[in-house]
Structure formats: C-alpha cells, structure tokens
C-alpha cells in the first residue's frame, strides 16, 4: 500500500526458475507491495512450482513473447499502482520506493539502468547495450520532444491503473521490442511521466535476448523501425501532459508528507 493505493508488481517469466522465488519474496518484503502477479509465459519446467511456494498469484499467457505477457499482466493486475519488473534478479525490490515517490505527481514512472554508478559489477550492461539503449531513448526524446529519456528497454516501470489499461488496450507488439511500444504509447497519449535511475544487478541465468548480441541488435532495429512508424502517424505537435493539480509549487514539506505516507 502506498498513499492509500494498492500496489501490484507484475513479473513476466520464461527462463527464471532459479531466481523467481527470491524476487517475489523480495518485493513482498518491501512492505509496500500488496500483490505480486506472475505471468507464466510458457516458462521452463519447475517455474510454476517455485511460484506456488510464495504468496504470488499466477496466470498463464500461452502466446509467446514479452509483449503478450506484459499486456496480460497490465490487464490482470488488481492494484491502483502497477509496477512492471523482471524476475531474474537484475532489479532491487527496494528501488520500488523510488518509483512510488513520484506516483503522486506522474501517471507513469520509468526506471533507467544506464546510470553508471548504479550498474553493478557483472551486470549485463556493457558499453554496447548501455549506449544502444541510451541512443534509442534519445531518438524518441528528440522526435517526440519529451521529458528526459536515457533507457528504452528498462522493464522497471510504474503505471497508474488508468494509464496501464490505456497502454495495454492499444498494444500491438507481442515480441521483445514491446518495451519501446509501451514507452511510445505512454508518450503519444499525453501521459505525464518521469524517469528515475535504478540499480542494475547481474542476472541469474542467461537472457534469451540480451545474452545474445545478434538478437540484441535485431531487437534494437525493430525498436527503431517502430519509433519511425509512430512518428509518421503521430500529430506534428504532441499533446502536452496535464498540469499538476497543485495550488502552489511543491515544497520540502510536501515531499516529506509523500515519503511518510
């Protein structure tokens, strides 16, 4: 619970049998998570049994792909604040508080893994992936004149329930480049968002995408083509996010009250 709102964490799993139980328990251990929803996307044998040892709720998405699993999770989660994360141990559960702090002011809070000081030794964020994610994010920032962006592929993201449903109902990408589509749909809908740095740790096991350089390049190219298609269809002048509902500029007292909720 955060500020009187239920918090759901959505994990999409395919090859994370050895880490998913610890990740689920880590999020419940933060004390602010009311629900962990796991979308089993044809996961490896034994994964469902590991999930069953926890308090998490499990749903099954037979259509293979990150986008299909994410869409299912956004629609199924019961919380008023919905946080997407990975079950592979790369994210710190306590970093959820960084996202929640901004949820009072923004309908979407996006994590970024490209802050050098928060990339842990051994994390799968070598120069190619780091600068590739940064470059594609900057392409979006420039083409759509958005707020600051530095990571197109970070799963660690928070959405209010309405924003989550709006994204899910308009998603078309079922594959690994769906993260870029989610970001683009957030932007073109005029959703107020902000990006915050999160820790990025070594993965437990091998990623089916970023663990193979050629696949990572292919996903990057798919993202760029998707961005260009969105830009061609989008209006010349993008909708501005709604103004904050404050009758005065935020003060240190306001920030203190938010943190204490």
Located regions from the model:
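Short aromatic/hydrophobic "clamp" motif used to bind/position activated sugar donors
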Residues: 82
